[in-house]
Amino acid sequence: MVSCWDTAVLPCALLGCLLLTGYCSGSKLKGPELSLKGTQHVMQAGQTLFLKCRGEAAHSWSLPTTVSQEDKKLSVTRSACGRNNRQFCSTLTLNMAQANHTGLYSCRYLPKSTSKEKKMESAIYIFVSDAGSPFIEMHSDIPKLVHMTEGRELIIPCRVTSPNITVTLKKFPFDALTPDGQRIAWDSRRGFIIANATYKEIGLLTCEATVNGHLYQTSYLTHRQTNTILDVQISPPSPVRFLRGQTLVLNCTVTTDLNTRVQMSWNYPGKATKRASIRQRIDQSNPHSNVFHSVLKINNVESRDKGLYTCRVKSGSSFRTFNTSVHVYEKGFISVKHRKQQVQETIAGKRSHRLSMKVKAFPSPEVVWLKDGVPATEKSARYSVHGYSLIIKDVTAEDAGDYTILLGIKQSKLFRNLTATLIVNVKPQIYEKSVSSLPSPPLYPLGSRQVLTCTVYGIPQPTIKWLWHPCHYNHSKERNDFCFGSEESFILDSSSNIGNRIEGITQRMMVIEGTNKTVSTLVVADSRTPGSYSCKAFNKIGTVERDIRFYVTDVPNGFHVSLEKIPTEGEDLKLSCVVSKFLYRDITWILLRTVNNRTMHHSISKQKMATTQDYSITLNLVIKNVSLEDSGTYACRARNIYTGEEILRKTEVLVRDLEAPLLLQNLSDHEVSISGSTTLDCQARGVPAPQITWFKNNHKIQQEPGIILGPGNSTLFIERVTEEDEGVYRCRATNQKGVVESSAYLTVQGTSDKSNLELITLTCTCVAATLFWLLLTLFIRKLKRSSSEVKTDYLSIIMDPDEVPLDEQCERLPYDASKWEFARERLKLGKSLGRGAFGKVVQASAFGIKKSPTCRTVAVKMLKEGATASEYKALMTELKILTHIGHHLNVVNLLGACTKQGGPLMVIVEYCKYGNLSNYLKSKRDFFCLNKDAALHMEPKKEKLEPDLEQDQKPRLDSVSSSESFTSSGFQEDKSVSDVEGGEDYSEISKQPLTMEDLISYSFQVARGMEFLSSRKCIHRDLAARNILLSENNVVKICDFGLARDIYKNPDYVRRGDTRLPLKWMAPESIFDKVYSTKSDVWSYGVLLWEIFSLGGSPYPGVQMDEDFCSRLKEGMRMRTPEYATPEIYQIMLDCWHKDPKERPRFAELVEKLGDLLQANVQQDGKDYIPLNAILTRNSGFTYSVPTFSEDFFKDGFTDPKFHSGSSDDVRYVNAFKFMSLERIKTFEELSPNATSMFEDYHLDTSSLLTSPLLKRFTWTETKPKASMKIDLRITSKSKEAGLSDLPGPSFCFSSCGHIRPVRQEDEDDPELGKESCCSPPPDYNSVVLYSSPPA
């Protein structure tokens, strides 16, 4: 209420300090004195107030708040006074005082010039009485706001201008607050004082005073003040990002109660330098709260402006802060990552699913979500974008797919995208369960074949199981023998014998209504046992089950009414009602209508008790001695157990009246020839039906041979009539009403001799016809057997059909899925490698096959698209054969198979890197040396291959195997199978020279493989070098032994009118007699040896494949020794080519012989392959050489040897065995000149066409030189082939360096030539060699 007015007294205070140094130094002072004594003074308005203050120190005046210091009516004068002018005096003059000048006036020492212990001020309250203004402040129109706090003192400041005025306090509208001196008190200086304010004082309060008959009022509005801060927020929300140079604006918003006031301030990194401008405002538009805003703004933000910004809010004792983080970037950026995994899963039916990414970007990019390449929000209204997330509402299976988020900041030209895959898992749903609406279960006829189907949809694909629940019977009266389900259940499979006999359980994928669904079918072979089948489908989301009540019935439609026969008056009426006991109960007979059409509807008391059988309940109705009145409509009534409905089955019963017998036609006399036949008819009617009896000559006729009685005895048939059959025949018809008869005489004509002749003729005819049909049947069977044998004999693999035909054997072979089945998900298919008769071979990567933890490259054989059932069966048969054969190192082995439903049939086999042996040997002709020593000194030389051969050198899979190519599959590549790309592997092995021990090793391994196949009773039938594959470590494997293919359907073997056969490799008995056996494979093995030791040469070079070739082969002609075969090897070939199959060696004997050639005294310890690296080296103590032979030896049938050694003394054998002396062998080189033409069959490696003599003769016209040897062919008296056979072959010998080079004929006299040992490559059977000089 007072204010200090001290500006004018400052000079006086300084002067006082100079004069009265003692007082200013802090000596004791008296308080100031006022000229008016007492605590108050009353004066009239318009008078002048003089108030003087005297003190010992400088002082100032404090005025009422209603008095302004700038008021012109107010003045203060100061002077020195007292004794020696040592005191300070000041006079306050107020001219023309008014009511608002009422208040407390005080004189107060200045703080610096007084002692704190003394009284510092003197005050007096001045009332300026004004009858027209009893209140100092008048608030009659607009109440003045008075803040209050509940529980504290409340002052209503209605101060008056005179202490004698009486004032009353009223609260709107009608309450009066009377002072009681305790809670409510009146003070003319302060107003009304309420000691402990409550919510009752809240409102409009009015002070009233009556002066001179006039009522004066002043109003106050109490306001309850609070300190409630409801909320503090900073926008934009944290973190706040800006680019350098932008304007930072932060808005701190405080929400409070209506009666709350706040103080707001900021703390931020640039506060010390006042980087920000701050402005505040209040929003009172909300009737329930106040909203205060404090806006901080920084222009051109810099890196130094980043940091923590804090908004501080204070209201009374309440204090709140809110922080936000500000980041300042030099340029924009976008970073997006998967929040979880790239593949997300959800469940169909979920209310919503959120697809979100971890996005860090500035400034905020534009966001677009795509589903399968289409904007998601356009695709469905269920999709909505929130921030960087896509919300999918009411998830369905159609929501599965690829979702891509597109982020773009155009001004920064920044764009990013990221794709996530959403898998919507669906709980299994059974289609039949949703569409089935039958009120009661169906019934299945006894003994019938039933097919139960369960169509299931779910993601992932559900597993379906069939269960059987046997019946548990309830023998209560209400539900007699009713079958109800039990908790006992049995899982079924195709071999289950629980309940009904199961024919099979199949499962397949079908597209139904555009959706892939799994259809499982249970086939019940014989319906006999009632119970319940359950189809249970489950996946990781859930399980669903469909119960199929399987009620067997022996009653048609489960309800049948039958009448035993139409009753006749006096007989018994028998009605039978049979119902299924699983569907009906409460069976009774009722009579619905009588014969006179009188409607009845009552039960029949004559019905018997119902009887229960295995499947039905029978209720019989028997009425004895029926009369015509018993006719009517009878009905059997039964109640359906499931629906409660009463079912009626009606039958009409008409009781017939008795009627005497009546013959429709009388018998008549007639004649019949002996040995003939005759028929007598006796048709009669009556009620009941008459019984007919036949008599001959009054003797009753019984049925016997030659005499046949027809139905109801109404017809008498006599066969082969004899003389004894002549006589009187009589028929009698009888029933309860009477008897009727008719008779006739039968006359027999002719004698018995004629009859015997006819009988003999008939017998002979029957015997002749029987013999004819027997011969015809045998002939047809022979034709069928021949056709079957031809078809069976040409299967690539033949399992000795000693007792059972091949097709039946293959059908009986088992397939062990637990051993061979491989998951398709762990198989990654690659490129196609080839196609066969009914299938194709593709390259694949298999993880974990044969329990390996690594990835292995394999070959997969599968059917072509659109394969037939027979082709599927053929491939399945091949798979069974491969599983039956088993594993061996020297065969291409089966690794696994994929046979389960839901995908194609796949057969997984090994692959071999280096292709077939034939092409490999051809490529090694320039790299061949006899032993390892020469090979170690051979200089590397790049092979020069023929263009067509180069193509063959690429690693490939022949028939069932393939080359490997690395395919990234996410697995570790199996180093034992594949170290590098196939081409690199071949380039490495191509640099290695080929030695004699390699050739023997190949021969030995093939023999071991064939020994294994023969032990498994398998016949290869097409053993050749092209069907031998080369794998790692010089291991060879036999292939093409497991393909169950019919060569008549193979384009490589079949031509209409001609028959393609691999004649060069076939044994004579196979060519002429179509007989295939292990011995015929031995013959083919001999041809294979010839291929190996000619380094891939074509068998029978220069020989035309025609009928003449076959004839000479049958006569004993054989191939000459190949270029690099020793006598021991050639002897083995001749043994394999023995004319008598029984004299040919077994494969076990061949293994032993070749093993002896490989290594002396080797203990094999069960190994399938003998390592050869340490054999035939210098350090082994053996020097492998081919012995020289005398000229006489070659005169005995051998051509010039290709092996010579420098000294015969150095020749030794490696575990050589003693051969029988070679007999004179005719070879195809001795053919007449007209029989052959030079090199015309060199290209026919795989098969030859056996045709008529008009077969074209193939010639090879390429003349590319292979070597520098040139010998002029000038012999005209011999054929080209004979000329070649008489030429001395190029020398082949050992050298220290191992080089191979041709020998020029003109250098034979060179003395230096003998010192340098050298060798020449074998002839290339794919090109013509020209000789420039005649033979010596």
From Swiss-Prot:
Biased composition, class Low complexity, residue ranges: 959-969
Cytoplasmic-facing ranges: 781-1336
Reactions mediated catalytically: L-tyrosyl-[protein] + ATP = O-phospho-L-tyrosyl-[protein] + ADP + H(+)
InterPro entries registered for this protein in UniProt: Ig-like_dom, Ig-like_dom_sf, Ig-like_fold, Ig_I-set, Ig_sub, Ig_sub2, Kinase-like_dom_sf, Prot_kinase_dom
GO CC annotation: endosome; extracellular space; nucleus; plasma membrane; receptor complex
One Pfam family from the record: Ig_3
Region (Disordered): 941-982, 1304-1326
Disulfide bridge map: 53-107, 158-207, 252-311, 454-535, 577-636, 682-731
Cleavage (site feature) positions: 767-768
Matching Gene3D superfamilies: Immunoglobulins (2.60.40.10), Phosphorylase Kinase, domain 1 (3.30.200.20), Transferase(Phosphotransferase) domain 1 (1.10.510.10)
SUPFAM superfamilies: Immunoglobulin, Protein kinase-like (PK-like)
Similarity remark: Belongs to the protein kinase superfamily. Tyr protein kinase family. CSF-1/PDGF receptor subfamily.
Protein name: Vascular endothelial growth factor receptor 1
The organism of origin for this protein: Rattus norvegicus
